[in-house]
From Swiss-Prot:
Gene Ontology cellular component list: cytoplasm
Organism lineage string: Bacteria, Bacillati, Bacillota, Bacilli, Bacillales
Pfam families linked: IGPD
Principal subcellular localisation of the protein: cytoplasm
Family per record: Belongs to the imidazoleglycerol-phosphate dehydratase family.
Protein name per the record: Imidazoleglycerol-phosphate dehydratase
Compartment(s) of residence: Cytoplasm
GO biological process: L-histidine biosynthetic process
NCBIfam families given in the database record: PRK00951.2-1, PRK00951.2-4, PRK00951.2-5
Length: 194
């Protein structure tokens, strides 16, 4: 089974995370960052993963450390769960509407971490959540999972809807990229490795 667990304890956060690629969209998420909890639920459901997260952090300061460290743990668990990457599709993309917002995510599980993000959120906060943390989370996810991740929010007026579309598209794109294609022999690269 393609799954992995991660634990990370620092002076700022305490995180336990379990991730399964070939899941059923089951999420058991407990964080002290409610908006991130909501986004991880959406990501899990739309990616058909199984994800358990128990995360506590110094949110009396702000949500930065908790959000960043969840991204680190999820990226590491995703990379480990992929294993040797034999037979995966490698590439995935999704275009997802959420009411008036439209987001697109494209991913390459290339072992070359990069984040390219084009999103102009109209509001700096959704509730108490700083919207700049979306970039922070995605960058740490891409870095630790060693993926090339492109995120474009084409348009939208409601910041919540725009971010929600991103997380749904992220789940769907990663589901596609991590899927096993029986036609693929070895890893999908002319180099013979990823």
């Amino acid at each position: 089974m393609r799954k992995a667990e991660r634990a990370r304890t620092t002076n700022e956060t305490d995180i336990k995370l379990a991730f399964e690629i070939d899941g059923e969209g089951k999420a058991d998420i407990s964080t002290d960052v409610p908006f991130m909890t909501h986004m991880l639920d959406l990501f899990t459901k739309h990616g058909q993963f199984n994800l358990t997260v128990d995360a506590k952090g110094d949110t009396e300061i702000d949500d930065h450390h908790t959000t960043e460290d969840i991204g680190i743990c999820l990226g590491q668990a995703f990379l480990e769960a992929l294993g040797d990457k034999k037979g995966i599709k490698r590439y995935g993309s999704a275009l997802v509407p959420m009411d008036e917002a439209l987001a697109q995510v494209a991913v390459d599980l290339s072992n070359r971490p990069h984040l390219e993000m084009r999103a102009a959120f109209p509001q700096a906060k959704v509730g108490t959540f700083d919207t700049e943390l979306v970039h922070e989370f995605l960058w740490k996810l891409a870095l630790e999972a060693r993926m090339n991740l492109h995120v474009i929010v084409h348009y939208g007026t409601n910041t919540h809807h725009m971010i929600e579309a991103v997380f749904k598209a992220l789940g769907r794109a990663l589901d596609e990229a991590s899927s096993i294609d029986p036609r693929v022999k070895g890893v999908p690269s002319t180099k013979g490795m990823l």
